[in-house]
Amino acid sequence: DLPVLRETSTTAAVNMRIAPSWLRIGNFELHSIRGEWESVRVLGEYVAREMYGWTDVVKGGETWADAEARAGCEGEPRPPWAARLVKEVAKRNAKTFALWQTYGFMHGVLNTDNISLMGDTIDYGPYAFMDAINEDEICNHSDVMGRYSFKMQPTMLVYAIDRLMDALAPVLGFEHVHGRALRPGELLASTKEERQMWADQAEEVLYDDVRMLVQTTLLDAWATAWTTRLGIASQRRIGVDRIKSEIVDPFFKAFYGLDMTRSLRMLCDFPGRTNDIEAFAASLVQDAAAGVPDCASQADVAAWLHQFKTWLDAEARPASELTNAMKRVNPRFVLRNWITDDVAERLESNAPDTAFLERVRTMCANPFESYAHEEDAELCTVGRLLRTNTPSCSS
């Protein structure tokens, strides 16, 4: 019953989150900025060996001699791990961000302390799923500059990976120069000038390559996810550029202001209704309307559908098969912010409504069901728009 003062006085709660690991980019930054280079080395070796399973890496905290004896390679230099680690973090997170950009998920606070080394989605406080389609959407009302807006999320990943490379720069440069991993105490015993020289080496030989790795990995996963979601998976072969310029970018423009989840769920039925595109467009615009001004018109949607039909025709699959495949990857239900608000309000009432909580939890675990029952169907609607009730870092 203890009230907590945030934007308003609100009821306190204990929230337990579970993840395979809570290590994040910020853990490396913390030790690096303090000059705790042994901690940087031990942490890196731990992540490489225990989290990624790289058995050729010394186990964090293990002596060099013990590691060599265990591996049966006494006297042999241990292979570098730092550049591999950076690239692994980059690839894992790029694939996760690609799914965010496909499903309209907005994290809200993408600082380096909220980006997992495992590539999992963690610490998403003021998160949201996009309702009214707008690539400039912001889900955190503390983010007045739009730093973490939907369209900026990939950019913020590149920024975060840059900061990871900064934190590991002396290690990266040392490994590049010497062709082996650090020994215990070796970086700590080096001079400031040596560490700066190695850091400069790392920036020169690695940074641009890793940035390109983030971009190509993210775009490749993004194109695969979008073509799968749209039922045109075989068209993935035409390349990212055409998928982006001919289908996805025009989708965001044509469907502007319509609810993203409902629009894509309705598109699942389009393969069986391509004979009357104008009627289908009218139905979609009406059903996915989010009540925002200057939203997409029936003509906008119909024009996109005509182009989309040519892509579906190229699949050469029965309409029913396409529809079923699309419904397996296009959710009917997403956990919108107004739903979590309703759950909290019902639990805070004099007679806590735990049944409603359990119903929402069940729907979260089964988002692709049809949910035809009236009460469940209501939870699949736009409800209260995100922009009218945007959470903050303190929510």
Residue locations for each model-derived region?
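ATP-dependent phospho-/nucleotidyl transfer catalytic cores
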Residues: 2-107, 118-246
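Regulatory N- and C-terminal appendages and interdomain linkers associated
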Residues: 146-395
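Polar low-complexity intrinsically disordered regions
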Residues: 62-77, 105, 111, 299, ...
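Catalytic-loop Lys-Pro-X-Asn motif of eukaryotic-like protein kinases
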Residues: 112-113, 117
